[in-house]
Regions:
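Signature of N6-adenine DNA methyltransferases within the class I
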Residues: 1-8, 14-15, 20-51, 57, ...
């Protein structure tokens, strides 16, 4: 999936937002391919063992990404957000992450995420998806059709690339 995420990064960014770095797998892969790219990195779990020679712990902002006062708009955002169901406005953290990242995306920017495939059918994602479709395009999707890609989890995922074009229907 890391290879697919990297192949979907088409904006030639100098800076990428990664809102939930986990062990740093995506950043490691992207950095191995292009070590000139810088990252703004967030992670809620400050006890996580970051397995990445490209990430210095002091460069990671530890805390709840969804609560961070971020003013920067990004050309490229990548991620594999948590899939937990929690008491949030949508009931699913990954939907909240997509929504927040959509808001932080500049016009012409790309959002490349690994999320549960069910996202595109969730009632709680309907308004977000309509807003995204009215202001951009899902340009690429990849469905690996393998529910056992993640250690200790069984989830059917999809990788998508979304490009924010501004209001294409107005």
């Amino acid at each position: 999936l890391r290879k697919k995420v990297y192949s979907f990064i088409l904006n030639k960014p100098s800076l990428i937002l990664e809102p939930s770095i986990g062990r740093g797998d995506l950043i490691n892969y992207v950095s191995e391919k292009d070590d000139t790219i810088k990252f703004d990195m967030y992670e809620i779990d400050d006890t996580i063992n970051i397995l990445n020679k490209y990430i210095s712990r002091d460069k990671v902002i530890f805390g709840d990404f969804l609560e961070q006062p971020i003013k920067t708009k990004y050309k490229t955002i990548i991620g594999n957000p948590p899939y937990k169901r929690m008491k949030t406005k949508t009931g699913n953290l990954y939907i909240d992450f997509v929504s927040r990242c959509y808001d932080l995306l500049e016009v012409g920017g790309e959002l490349v995420f690994i999320i549960p495939k069910i996202f595109f059918k969730k009632k709680s994602a309907e308004d977000l998806l309509n807003n995204m479709k009215n202001n951009g395009t899902f340009t690429h999707t990849y469905h690996p059709d393998n529910k056992h890609l993640f250690e200790g989890a069984s989830v059917d995922v999809i990788v998508f690339r979304y490009c924010k074009d501004g209001n294409i229907n107005g």
